[in-house]
Amino acid sequence: MLRRYLATSASATASATATASASASASASKNSIKSNFKFHPEYKFKCGLEIHTQLKTKYKLFSLSRTSFNDTPNSHISYFDVGLPGTQPKLNPEALYLALKAAVALNCEVQQMSRFDRKHYFYPDQPMGYQITQNFHPLAKNGYLTFNEFDGVEIATSKDGANDTIRIEKIQLEQDTGKKYGDIIDYNRAGIPLIEVVTKPDFDSIEKVLAFVKKYQLLVRHFDICSGDLETGAIRVDVNVNVNDSPRVEIKNISTTGDIVNAIKYEYNRQVETLTKGGSLEQQTRNWDGIRTNLARSKENAIDYRYFPDSELPQIILSPDIAHDIKTSLPESPDSLLARLTSSPHNLQLAHAKNLITEPELLHYYESFFAIHRKPDADKWVFQELLTAFAKLGKTFDVEIVKPNVFAHLVSMDLNLVSKRLILKHMVQNEVSLDKAIEQLGFKEDQKPTTELAEDICKEIILTNQQIVDRIQSGHAKAVEVLVGNAMKKTRGKFAAQTFRSLFKEQLGIS
């Protein structure tokens, strides 16, 4: 549920932190857009993307097999998925709805009529001998996604703002293929619904390519269209690169944002080098192996897919009002939410705002908490205290354990931060109510820590630690921290450490 956030919230050991830092540094050095790379003014860079996105449906696009393709190999397949004769496809309406949500979110023109075509090729991961896709009449066309100040790229480079916008050529609904592991094929993935989002070649920098992919991930997660993960293959990106209007080169097998950066840099340099040596470029498909792009096929031996309409599937005929109806049913857009959450009265950090957008349950929790707390530190209480408490205990965030109104009451209590953390930890660890935690930890009104109680505790500790007291009075003032530690342990964090520190210094007559 909140794994992406909680995984990064838990405290790490010093050695793990050092290892992570070294790894991050090495990765940054390898994947940095700027490192040892530049575009040459005389060789204009153009780029477009083809983004394959798995839709979050319970069943496959044309069968009732489940979409859990990471389970035991070939455990979620039907006769249709493996192309056995006598089986016919039946369109999953949930997949159509999610595809339409994506089309509306990307500002596309939803087509009143679309239909499916067969894309013929022979490969072990496609047992039917063809893929069902939408080549001639896609579901949606002519969309766009616009960059803004939240995307981390330079924008507004032309008066009409054209360079701020990436045009979407089309969105087509299609089925995924099986997955090949050496000589073995797993067909669990075969038939999972996909949308292919094809952009125009509007990218003039690698920064914009990355910004678009991240913005797209945020969008599909927020609208619950797809998990948005590149590492699991839920989103797969093919990159089209060309220089000076030469024939485009399609790069496949790209699985991370780092690979996107490095594949583009390598391919751009390869094309520039070819041209500077007097060579010519041809339309190609190339595979990325993590270091370089390798020729898969050229225009001369390109596959003729022999597209033709799928006679077993009817046309999709939609109401003229469908786009408007879906748009009005969607929640607030990511850009609108970011603008609202990063401005007054919330004033959230951009990273925190983006985390909220990708986790609807957490967003609802934060807004419910803020409606009661209504102070600038609301995000700190949620992110730095609440979520960290769950993460440190290795637990998944559960709103039922600490409801927003209960958390707001805890935050408003007349207790120091250490005491509030102690109560929160007790609630999460033992799954008890706030009242029960207060009672079990001794924070009831008649048990509340007072200055008089703190003074008495200090006197008691001084009397029972004469050796440490003698050391302090002989000039080793830092030894007072031992007494402070004993007092904190005795009171289980009911007082701030500074309270005891000041009292010990006062009672021992040291500065």
From Swiss-Prot:
Q: Which GO terms describe its biological process?
A: glutaminyl-tRNAGln biosynthesis via transamidation; mitochondrial translation
NCBIfam families assigned to the protein according to its UniProt record, in alphabetical order? gatB, PRK05477.1-2
Lineage of the species this protein comes from: Eukaryota, Fungi, Dikarya, Ascomycota, Saccharomycotina
Function in brief: Allows the formation of correctly charged Gln-tRNA(Gln) through the transamidation of misacylated Glu-tRNA(Gln) in the mitochondria. The reaction takes place in the presence of glutamine and ATP through an activated gamma-phospho-Glu-tRNA(Gln).
Q: What interactions and quaternary structure are annotated?
A: Subunit of the heterotrimeric GatFAB amidotransferase (AdT) complex, composed of A, B and F subunits.
- Compartment list: Mitochondrion
Q: Which InterPro entries match?
A: Asn/Gln-tRNA_amidoTrfase_suB/E, Asn/Gln-tRNA_Trfase_suB/E_cat, Asn/Gln_amidotransferase, GatB, GatB_Yqey_C_2, Gln-tRNA_amidoTrfase_suB_CS, Gln_synth/guanido_kin_cat_dom
Highest taxon in the source lineage: Eukaryota
Q: Which UniProt keywords apply?
A: ATP-binding, Ligase, Mitochondrion, Nucleotide-binding, Protein biosynthesis, Transit peptide
Q: What is its EC number?
A: 6.3.5.-
What protein does this entry describe? Glutamyl-tRNA(Gln) amidotransferase subunit B, mitochondrial
A GO cellular component entry from the record = mitochondrion
Extent of the transit peptide: 1-6
Please list the GO terms describing molecular function.
ATP binding; glutaminyl-tRNA synthase (glutamine-hydrolyzing) activity
Catalyzed chemical reaction(s) = L-glutamyl-tRNA(Gln) + L-glutamine + ATP + H2O = L-glutaminyl-tRNA(Gln) + L-glutamate + ADP + phosphate + H(+)
- In this record, what's one Pfam family? GatB_N
Q: Which residues form a coiled coil?
A: none
Q: Which family does it belong to?
A: Belongs to the GatB/GatE family. GatB subfamily.
